[in-house]
């Protein structure tokens, strides 16, 4: 994982509520264990017609969505089953942060382990983002703030360990491996 301190990008707004992990990436794409290429399957049933042609009316297929790395989603994003492929697909598609008023716990944990910043904002701040598709927004992981289109900032919660991992570009296993010498010394002292 790459360290993430600040993400500055225009936003893509997907105002649908209760987007579950099967809508993020349908089950037929879960047969792989390689993260690369899963971005093509992101929101597949919404992005593509039955013949595989892109649907021009879907927000992520529009030209103005290209290069955006912040997704503003409706309430209760990532609900449903535990599907690590969902954050894999988002990250592979270039999404670095998802902003909502509520993000499902399992999705949130999987996102953090894969370098995707789950941002939960208060309803008023979130409404400002929903009303301004394509606006430039800044997500500051270190300060735990989002700079909104009007220049105001909103705080978002992030536990200390998750914040440490994002800022240092490590997952839980990477963190433990970095402590190997200390763990060995502790174990050696117990014998």
UniProtKB/Swiss-Prot annotation:
The keyword Amino-acid biosynthesis applies. Its EC number is 4.2.1.33. Catalyzes the isomerization between 2-isopropylmalate and 3-isopropylmalate, via the formation of 2-isopropylmaleate. It comes from Anaeromyxobacter dehalogenans (strain 2CP-1 / ATCC BAA-258). It is an enzyme of class 4 (lyase). This is 3-isopropylmalate dehydratase small subunit. CDD domains: IPMI_Swivel (cd01577). GO terms for molecular function: 3-isopropylmalate dehydratase activity. It catalyses: (2R,3S)-3-isopropylmalate = (2S)-2-isopropylmalate. One of its GO terms (biological process) is L-leucine biosynthetic process. It comes from the Bacteria. GO terms for cellular component: 3-isopropylmalate dehydratase complex. The keyword Nucleotidyltransferase does not apply. The gene is leuD.
């Amino acid at each position: 994982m790459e360290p993430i301190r600040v993400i500055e990008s225009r936003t893509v707004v997907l105002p649908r509520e209760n987007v579950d992990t099967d809508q993020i990436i349908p089950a037929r794409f879960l047969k792989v264990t390689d993260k690369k290429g899963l971005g093509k399957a992101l929101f597949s049933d919404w992005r593509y017609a039955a013949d595989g042609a892109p649907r021009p009316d879907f927000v992520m297929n529009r030209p103005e969505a290209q290069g955006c790395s912040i997704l503003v989603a409706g309430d209760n994003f990532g609900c449903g089953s535990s599907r690590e492929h969902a954050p894999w697909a988002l990250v592979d598609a270039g999404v670095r942060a998802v902003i909502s008023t509520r993000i499902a716990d399992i999705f949130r944990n999987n996102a953090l382990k894969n370098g995707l910043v789950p941002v939960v904002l208060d309803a008023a701040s979130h409404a400002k983002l929903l009303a301004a598709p394509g606006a430039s927004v800044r997500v500051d992981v270190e300060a735990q703030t989002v700079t909104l289109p009007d220049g105001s900032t909103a705080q978002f919660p992030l536990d200390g360990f998750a914040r440490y991992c994002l800022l240092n570009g490590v997952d839980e296993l990477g963190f433990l491996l970095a402590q190997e010498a200390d763990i060995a010394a502790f174990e050696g002292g117990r014998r």
